């Protein structure tokens, strides 16, 4: 970070403080609004269809957890702004890890909102957009890394796969819990869901962990990104073939695209620098 011009460091620090204040003050209110509307729609849906009975409980747990996590990383973003402005190397990976959370969490809350409410603009989307602007701002202000296009592509795909991993993991869990034949794995569909859901959740953790590690040019980050992306691809492609649900295809396609990108030698060399061997 010390090779980065002071002006860029100061701008990045200001961006972190602004995003952190938003996450700590405005985001909880916006996410509460999204939670209320989504829960209301899910309760009505569950009353009409018992197979959706798990939806309200899963949302009532996952949405507040995302809201709390976004609040905490907002405070963390403010805390690391000063050492980042002074050029501490550890702060840039930490900043990306923090700013990925509102982008991922906001989108993870937006997708159920759009699917269940759908007639108004999702308040959680504002959180996603603010997170993305700050995330890309921090990426683009790092002018001392060169070839920023590769960074933007890879770190965007990591965020997309992480988001889909959470959504698919939670959705698979909900569908599995709602089946009256559980815990028996009767039929190909429920058996596929019992695998793809947990694999997607684990893949989410791996691809998220890859963000700060790759920002620090750690080889472990490349491996975590590759393992997470190939796992979500391998688990969700058969589930799509069996269920014909498009969101499993989205997960498989995003995983394949990330894995293929990471395997390009020029991309790997760019991400890891001297740590390619």
Go through the PLM ranges and name each one.
Residues 1-277:
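Topology signature of small-to-medium multi-pass alpha-helical membrane proteins
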């Amino acid at each position: 970070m010390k090779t980065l011009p002071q002006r860029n460091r100061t701008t990045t620090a200001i961006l972190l403080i602004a995003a952190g204040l938003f996450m700590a003050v405005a985001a909880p209110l916006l996410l509460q609004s999204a939670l209320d509307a989504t829960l209301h729609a899910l309760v009505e849906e569950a009353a009409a269809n018992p197979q959706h009975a798990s939806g309200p409980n899963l949302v009532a747990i996952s949405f507040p957890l995302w809201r709390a996590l976004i609040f905490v990383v907002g405070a963390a973003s403010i805390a690391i702004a000063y050492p980042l402005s002074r050029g501490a190397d550890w702060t840039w990976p930490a900043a990306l890890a923090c700013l990925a959370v509102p982008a991922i969490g906001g989108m993870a809350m937006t997708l159920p909102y759009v699917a269940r409410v759908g007639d108004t603009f999702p308040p959680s989307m504002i959180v996603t957009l603010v997170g993305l602007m700050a995330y890309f701002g921090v990426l683009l202000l790092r002018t001392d890394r060169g070839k920023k296009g590769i960074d933007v592509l890879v770190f965007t795909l990591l965020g997309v796969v992480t988001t889909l991993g959470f959504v698919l993991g939670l959705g698979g869990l909900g569908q599995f819990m709602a089946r009256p034949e559980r815990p028996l794995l009767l039929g190909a569909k429920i058996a596929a869901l019992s695998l793809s859901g947990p694999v997607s959740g684990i893949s989410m953790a791996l691809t998220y962990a890859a963000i700060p590690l790759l920002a620090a040019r750690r080889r472990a980050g490349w491996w975590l990104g590759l393992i997470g992306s190939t796992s979500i691809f391998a688990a969700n492609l058969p589930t799509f073939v069996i269920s014909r649900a498009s969101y499993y295809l989205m997960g498989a396609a995003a995983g394949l695209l990330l894995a293929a990108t990471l395997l390009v030698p020029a991309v790997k060399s760019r991400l890891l620098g001297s740590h390619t061997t």
